[in-house]
Amino acid sequence: MLCIGITGGIGAGKSLLSSTFSQCGGIVVDGDVLAREVVQPGTKGLSSLVDAFGQDILLPGGALDRRALAVKAFRDDAARNVLNGIVHPLVANRRAEIIAAISEDAVVVEDIPLLVESGMAHLFPLVVVVHADVELRVRRLVEQRGVAETDARARIAAQASDEERRAVADVWLDNSSTPEVLVQRARDLWYHRILPFAYNLSQRQAVYAPAGLVTSDPIWLGQAKRIVARLKTTCGHKALRVDHIGSTAVPHYPGFPDFQAKDIIDIQITVESLAMADELADPLLSAGYPRLEHVTGDAAKTNARSTVDRYEHSSDPNLWHKRFHASADPGRPTYVHIRVAGWPNQQFGLLFVDWLKANPGVRADYLDVKRTADRLAAGDMGRYADAKEPWLLDAYRRAWEWADSTGWRL
């Protein structure tokens, strides 16, 4: 089952996005509907709201007066936090009940207005944010919903900022044009990314790195930050650390030539043992990262290095074993390397990035090697890796010489 999260500020067009995905075949779990359900007359939720905000948030018949509640709950951060503290846990429990009853082959669309504010974004393999600027949203609320302008602005101000939403957005859909334009963008997203993602996940099938080198893209760092947060949430205490590694972790440095890389995000999860790595297989699959069992380790080095004494200068090839997962999302190819803390391959994954960042000459040399390898490989990733290996073997020695000279440690 693929569960995606969608969100957007009030008046941005989230309801239209949700209904479009529903028409495409998605099973929509609407956070607004659940939020209303858990505060119906006679519920614990409504009783708690009355205790917190007073009897005057009720209509004469005993139902919740949502406008009266909004006036009180959105007046400041403290009041909003009280509201969220009551409603969010109740909605989460009801959501879990609904999800548990849905077929495993479904694509579940979770429509969550406060996805960012509730800290739930990292629970989803894909987050879609629909956006419109503030003035357009105010106009829609006033003209289409009859909300007073001052209330509209207060509600918008009480929600997450555009920057906070953009930070969690795997997909950013602009809705400043007509409804028809948003519908078409949503349908394109559904059929070209979401459905292929769901299929790949059902088949435990990964997306591999596209052929060719591309110039370093500033968005890689933001994408990796989201992936790291998602994987930390998925792995919990079983991950000792989660890091962005590889060439996409090397930013552009002004005044130096552009670096290049395959358009693939490499992530390293550090664990205490391979047994712990195996325990992460199912959680990572649910997060969108199936395991590729044919990849069992990295190219071993003799007299390997480590800052951990018992692994220092070891020639044991078993210390280069790992587990390997990759993303099923065609929109963001990602490799996930799970390595054991202190083992030579885990340490070199981190050292190599720091060495590249600190040495412009090394970056230039490595780029030349990658360009040659890319040309010789003609799109074959195995040949590409093999062509780089002689340089990387020497780079292993040079990187550790740099580590020794600079006092590099984890």
UniProtKB/Swiss-Prot annotation:
Its EC number is 2.7.1.24. Residues 196-410 are annotated as: UPF0157. One of its GO terms (molecular function) is ATP binding. The keyword ATP-binding applies. One of its GO terms (biological process) is coenzyme A biosynthetic process. Disulfide bonds: none annotated. It is an enzyme of class 2 (transferase). ATP binds at residues 11-16. PROSITE patterns: DPCK. It comes from the Bacteria. Residues 3-201 form the DPCK domain. Pathway: Cofactor biosynthesis; coenzyme A biosynthesis; CoA from (R)-pantothenate: step 5/5. It catalyses: 3'-dephospho-CoA + ATP = ADP + CoA + H(+). It holds the Pfam family CoaE. It is found in: Cytoplasm. The C-terminal UPF0157 domain is involved in the proper folding of the full length enzyme. Catalyzes the phosphorylation of the 3'-hydroxyl group of dephosphocoenzyme A to form coenzyme A. NCBIfam families: dephospho-CoA kinase, PRK03333.1. PANTHER family: BIFUNCTIONAL COENZYME A SYNTHASE-RELATED, DEPHOSPHO-COA KINASE-RELATED. This is Dephospho-CoA kinase.
